[in-house]
């Protein structure tokens, strides 16, 4: 049983049905079965009927005689009719007189079971409220006790009308007056709430319940006998269950966390397709005024035109202003915006408007529009020329075909650029384009901006050098998953999203209806025959895979290239694959390769036709001619089933009338019927510039496109088809260049071709024109591709979409894509699942500047009337490519920087490696002799304690005597286990030098000084610096001589010392030649030039250390011959 308020009927039925219903069958017509919820109340209630009848006889008298007294005991009299309204609380059972005067509401019990089919109000919309709060009835009769806000009816009149309304219940049931009144009130409420900008406040304010209870105290006492077994709160309405509805629902709804980036124009519908009126989620009607956000950021480096900053221009050249275009364009000026609009709703116009205003606001900044293909770029150029009025002289179109030198000149001279993203990133990396000059980047088909696509690289590169630029992203389908949409937002630094669907309220008047016809097909007899023969040919190879547990499928017709690739990877990673012999691995890889190549042919047979399947088998067979092909490939070709299959296919494909797929047959009929209904026959409309209608057919493979074109060409000139494919060349099919693509699009618009058979190249963005019929020859599991295909029609007039699907996988893919699209649209519209980059969206405009909209018709310059694309002209000799230029970001530190500075760590001071100069020793003052010698007491103590070996023997320890054995001390004595130490050798060398000194040493020394002074000039002699090679060798000679002496063997040392002792004194003199060659030092010369005999002799250290400065390098050892 349903009421006008489906939400609350069950609640009141449960409370009242359990307590006050004796015989539910009396509530409705005897022919009508009782409701299921009341059926359980029939038993166990007859005992109380007698007691209740005495109280309810007056109620039965109000009937027309057809109803018995027991009918007043039915549930209807005590159901919602007895439920008080939320505005007051009152007892339900009163005495008979008062009950007769106060007729309450009732539950509508239809006599016919199908009465619900005529009720279109199944779920009334509600103001926002939390789900846990119970809501009262949506519509009630006016309360006679309290005046309403809208209609102030006197109480007696209301009571009288209600008495009359309650007088004849059977008439009310038959004529459904209550239901009509409810429907009219619901429609009136719907219109009122639709016109309100905010949720309506309840019409009546519930007064205090105490006065009402006081006024009816006698009635409560009279009915106590009926309420003894009923709880006090049994008949409480939702007012007692929940707070008053006026203030509570609004704050409760706002307490939920919702995104501030909620887009406009998104409406929520119920399960029955009705609109859920939540004013907070609805877009504001009409045009809105947005201002740039106030941000604290450094001033922009772009030179701004202060005179133009006060306004932003909205072109009105196209006629009527669309509110959604106005609002989106205004928001796109001040935020990094992602615009998701269905195809044909003016994304190009929005982009042209934003480009025009940034062109006005800046003096020399550059604006870049990027699109994946050249046809999409050319399409935007026409919009900027014809709508926005951007001068052609400031515009250029750059692609990879232009030489780098020409592109460099264009970057210096122009301000607006239309190009592909690959060309833009190349110019940025080579320094041809200055990233600091770019102020706006418009990205078309923005759903591609994921991963490492060129769109993402462009934005990242610009962000390194420029923090003051705007991004506008345009797409019809942002993505198929939450992750893909978030990747687009992250890759382009998006801060706001504006999304519209075809059900959005503000675009409904601009969207034409699209009639979608889905046709499913089964395999034909020819296809079943081909599948059986192909399965027999492939079964042996499949069994070999299954025997090694490399593949689990049994049906060869279920093979797919992706499934075989995954199975190969899993087998190679398994233990059996890793431990298998090399020959087994080669065998498995060969079988997987052969089956994967034939899996594509199986897909062609299933979904595209027999002719593409036959072409694929011919190509597969050609690889086995001669010595080509592997063992398993030749095994398939030589199989009897395969040969039989080819014998069947060859005559079929040679027949020009053969149609190898049921979808192709139906496609031919659909296209023919469409053109015949449009009145385009063989001789019709030949004088018109444009045909009456156009058709576009989407296929997945080029083979299918060629087959469809071949079939449709039989019906020329009514059907004039042409293939529309991409640039890359494939086997048996040459690609189309971008110029060829543009030429085909222009001929399609003019009417040279009225049917285009396109692959995926025709899905995205192309303004191909007014297409009245879209035929999807195969389905796509991607919702992006599906929606792109369907968006080609229904732009300016109603369109039709025909989907041709095979039962099974293809049909499931379509359902999956459709559901995925609807779910993603809701997620994107809510905005709660995504993270936006508001910090990456700069204000750019100076603080305090708030541009005002200026709607006006733009004057189109005469130069824009030229139809050619603004490509740079080719020259006989292109300019030389400029050298690479490295642009630096602002506030960059040039020069070399240490790694410790970049890492932020402190740099350790490295000590200076230069040796400190040894200070000159100061002469020590010689102490007195008495201070050095021992005193008599100390001498006595030395002799007593240290010199005496013991008291028994007179053995005294004496000092070492250097004169006891003078000859033996000049040479080291023989040793056995312990060798002489360094001190012993130094002592021996010292004694040897002392022994070499003769009594005439002083005389010889004075003679040398005299000769030296006589041979030198009178000027003061300065010690020369050792700067020559010979000087270095002479200085190192003495050092090496001493090392050689110290490194001699013990026997050799003794022999040398013995010879020195036996040498006469005269032979120990230094040779005169060496004395004259070696320089004298300052300590060896006199300052006043006198050479008398009483001069001071140099000290011993000066004599021994002849070299003041020791060279760092060692010279060769030179042994002087004593005979020289």
From Swiss-Prot:
SMART domains: DEXDc (SM00487), HELICc (SM00490). The keyword Nucleus applies. Residues 874-886, 906-916 have a biased composition (Basic residues). Keywords: ATP-binding, DNA damage, DNA repair, DNA-binding, Helicase, Hydrolase, Nucleotide-binding, Nucleus. Residues 1-103, 123-302, 855-923, 1016-1124 are annotated as: Disordered. Residues 855-873 have a biased composition (Basic and acidic residues). ATP binds at residues 341-348. It is an enzyme of class 3 (hydrolase). Residues 328-496 form the Helicase ATP-binding domain. Residues 7-17, 169-178, 226-236 have a biased composition (Acidic residues). One of its GO terms (molecular function) is ATP binding. Residues 210-222, 255-271 have a biased composition (Polar residues). It catalyses: ATP + H2O = ADP + phosphate + H(+). GO terms for biological process: DNA replication, Okazaki fragment processing; donor selection; double-strand break repair via synthesis-dependent strand annealing; interstrand cross-link repair; negative regulation of strand invasion. SUPFAM superfamilies: P-loop containing nucleoside triphosphate hydrolases. Its EC number is 3.6.4.12. One of its GO terms (cellular component) is nucleus. A motif (DEAH box) lies at residues 444-447. Residues 666-840 form the Helicase C-terminal domain. Its main location: nucleus. Interacts with the MHF histone-fold complex to form the FANCM-MHF complex. PANTHER family: FANCONI ANEMIA GROUP M FANCM FAMILY MEMBER, FANCONI ANEMIA GROUP M PROTEIN. Belongs to the DEAD box helicase family. DEAH subfamily. FANCM sub-subfamily. ATP-dependent DNA helicase involved in DNA damage repair by homologous recombination and in genome maintenance. Capable of unwinding D-loops. Plays a role in limiting crossover recombinants during mitotic DNA double-strand break (DSB) repair. Component of a FANCM-MHF complex which promotes gene conversion at blocked replication forks, probably by reversal of the stalled fork. This is ATP-dependent DNA helicase mph1. The gene is mph1.
């Amino acid at each position: 049983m349903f009421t006008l308020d489906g939400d609350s009927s069950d609640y009141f039925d449960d409370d009242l049905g359990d307590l006050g219903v004796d015989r539910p069958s009396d509530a409705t017509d005897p022919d009508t079965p009782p409701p299921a919820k009341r059926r359980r109340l029939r038993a166990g209630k007859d005992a109380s009927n007698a007691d209740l009848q005495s109280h309810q006889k007056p109620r039965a008298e109000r009937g027309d005689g057809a109803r018995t007294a027991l009918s007043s005991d039915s549930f209807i009299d005590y159901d919602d009719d007895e439920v008080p309204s939320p505005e007051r609380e009152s007892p339900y059972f009163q005495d008979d007189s008062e009950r007769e005067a106060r007729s309450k509401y009732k539950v509508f019990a239809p006599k016919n079971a199908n009465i619900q089919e005529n009720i279109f109000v199944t779920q009334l919309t509600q103001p926002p409220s939390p789900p846990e709060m119970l809501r009262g009835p949506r519509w009630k009769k006016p309360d006679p006790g309290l005046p309403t806000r809208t209609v102030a009816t006197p109480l007696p009149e209301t009571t009288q009308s209600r008495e009359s309304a309650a007088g004849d219940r059977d008439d009310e049931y038959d004529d459904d007056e209550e239901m009509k009144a409810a429907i009219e009130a619901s429609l009136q409420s719907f219109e009122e709430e639709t016109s309100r900008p905010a949720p309506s406040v309840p019409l009546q304010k519930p007064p205090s319940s105490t006065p009402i209870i006081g006024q009816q105290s006698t009635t409560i006492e009279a009915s106590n006998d009926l309420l003894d077994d009923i709880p006090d709160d049994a008949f409480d309405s939702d007012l007692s269950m929940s707070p008053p509805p006026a203030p509570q629902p609004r704050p409760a709804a706002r307490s939920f966390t919702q995104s501030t980036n909620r887009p406009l124009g998104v409406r929520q519908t119920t399960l029955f397709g009705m609109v859920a009126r939540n004013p907070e989620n609805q877009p504001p009607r009409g045009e809105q005024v947005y201002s740039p956000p106030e941000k604290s950021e450094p001033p922009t480096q772009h030179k701004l035109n202060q005179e133009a900053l006060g306004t932003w221009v909205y072109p009105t050249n196209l006629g009527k202003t669309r509110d959604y275009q106005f609002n989106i364009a205004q928001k796109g000026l001040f935020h990094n915006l992602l615009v998701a609009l269905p195809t044909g709703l003016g994304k190009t116009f929005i982009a042209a408007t934003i480009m025009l205003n940034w062109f006005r606001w800046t003096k020399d900044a550059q604006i870049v529009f990027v699109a994946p293909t050249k046809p999409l770029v050319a399409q935007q150029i026409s919009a900027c020329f014809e709508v926005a009025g951007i001068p052609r002289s400031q515009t250029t179109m750059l692609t990879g075909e232009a030489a780098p030198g020409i592109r460099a000149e264009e970057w210096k001279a122009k301000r607006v650029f239309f190009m592909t993203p690959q060309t833009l990133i190349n110019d940025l990396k080579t320094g041809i384009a200055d990233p600091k000059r770019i102020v706006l980047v418009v990205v078309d088909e923005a759903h591609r901006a994921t991963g490492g696509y060129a769109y993402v690289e462009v934005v990242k590169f610009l962000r390194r050098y420029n923090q003051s630029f705007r991004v506008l992203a345009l797409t019809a389908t942002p993505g198929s998953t939450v992750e893909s949409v978030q990747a687009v937002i992250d890759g382009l630094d998006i801060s706001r999203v504006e999304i519209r669907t075809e059900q959005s309220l503000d675009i409904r008047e601009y969207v034409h209806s699209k009639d979608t016809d889905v046709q499913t097909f089964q395999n034909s007899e020819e296809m079943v025959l081909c599948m059986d023969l192909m399965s027999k040919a492939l079964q042996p190879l499949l069994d070999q895979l299954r025997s090694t547990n490399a593949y689990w499928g049994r049906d060869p017709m279920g093979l797919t290239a992706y499934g075989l690739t995954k199975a190969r990877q899993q087998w190679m990673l398994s233990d059996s694959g890793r431990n298998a012999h090399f020959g087994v691995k080669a065998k498995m890889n060969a079988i997987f390769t052969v089956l994967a190549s034939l899996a594509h042919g199986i897909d062609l047979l299933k979904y595209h036709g027999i002719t593409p399947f036959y072409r694929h088998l011919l190509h597969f067979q050609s690889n086995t001619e001669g010595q080509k092909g592997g063992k398993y490939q030749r095994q398939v070709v030589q199989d009897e089933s395969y040969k039989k299959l080819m014998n069947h296919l060859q005559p079929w494909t040679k027949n020009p009338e053969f149609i190898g797929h049921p979808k192709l047959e139906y496609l031919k009929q659909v296209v023919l019927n469409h053109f015949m209904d449009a009145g385009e026959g063989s001789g019709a409309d030949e004088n018109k510039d444009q045909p009456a209608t156009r058709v576009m057919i989407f296929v997945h493979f080029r083979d299918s496109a060629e087959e469809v074109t071949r079939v449709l060409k039989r019906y020329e000139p009514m059907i004039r088809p042409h293939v529309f494919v991409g640039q890359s060349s494939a086997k048996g099919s040459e690609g189309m260049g971008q110029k060829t693509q543009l030429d085909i699009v222009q001929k399609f618009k003019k009417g040279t071709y009225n049917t285009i058979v396109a692959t995926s190249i025709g899905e995205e963005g192309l303004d191909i024109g007014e297409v009245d019929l879209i035929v999807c020859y195969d389905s796509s599991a991607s919702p992006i591709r599906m929606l792109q295909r369907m968006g080609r029609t229904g732009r300016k007039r109603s369109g039709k979409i025909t989907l041709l699907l095979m039962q099974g996988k293809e049909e499931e893919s379509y359902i999956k894509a459709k559901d995925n699209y609807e779910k993603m649209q809701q997620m994107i519209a809510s905005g709660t699942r995504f993270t936006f980059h508001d910090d990456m969206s700069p204000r750019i405009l100076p603080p305090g500047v708030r541009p005002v909209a200026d709607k006006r018709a733009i004057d189109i310059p005469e130069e824009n009337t030229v139809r050619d694309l603004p490509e740079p002209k080719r020259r006989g000799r292109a300019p030389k490519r400029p050298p690479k230029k490295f642009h630096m970001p602002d506030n960059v530190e040039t020069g070399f920087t240490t790694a410790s500075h970049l890492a932020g760590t402190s740099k350790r001071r490295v000590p200076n490696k230069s040796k400190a100069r040894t200070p000159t020793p100061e002469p020590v003052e010689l102490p007195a002799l008495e201070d050095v010698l021992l005193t008599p007491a100390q001498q006595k103590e030395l002799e007593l304690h240290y010199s005496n070996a013991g008291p028994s023997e007179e053995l005294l320890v004496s000092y070492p005597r250097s004169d006891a054995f003078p000859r033996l001390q000049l040479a080291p004595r023989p040793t056995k286990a312990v060798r002489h130490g360094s001190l012993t050798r130094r002592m021996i060398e010292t004694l040897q030098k002392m022994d070499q000194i003769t009594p005439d040493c002083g005389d010889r020394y004075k003679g040398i000084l005299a000769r030296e002074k006589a041979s030198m000039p009178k000027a003061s002699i300065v010690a020369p610096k050792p700067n020559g090679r010979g000087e270095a060798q002479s200085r190192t000679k003495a050092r090496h001589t001493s090392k050689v002496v110290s490194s001699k063997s013990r026997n050799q040392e003794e022999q040398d010392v013995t010879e020195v002792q036996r040498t006469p004194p005269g032979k120990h003199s230094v040779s005169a030649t060496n004395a004259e060659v070696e320089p004298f030092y300052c300590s060896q010369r006199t300052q006043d030039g006198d050479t008398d005999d009483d001069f001071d002799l140099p000290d011993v250290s000066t004599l021994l250390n002849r070299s003041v400065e020791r060279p760092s390098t060692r010279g060769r050892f030179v042994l002087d011959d004593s005979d020289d």
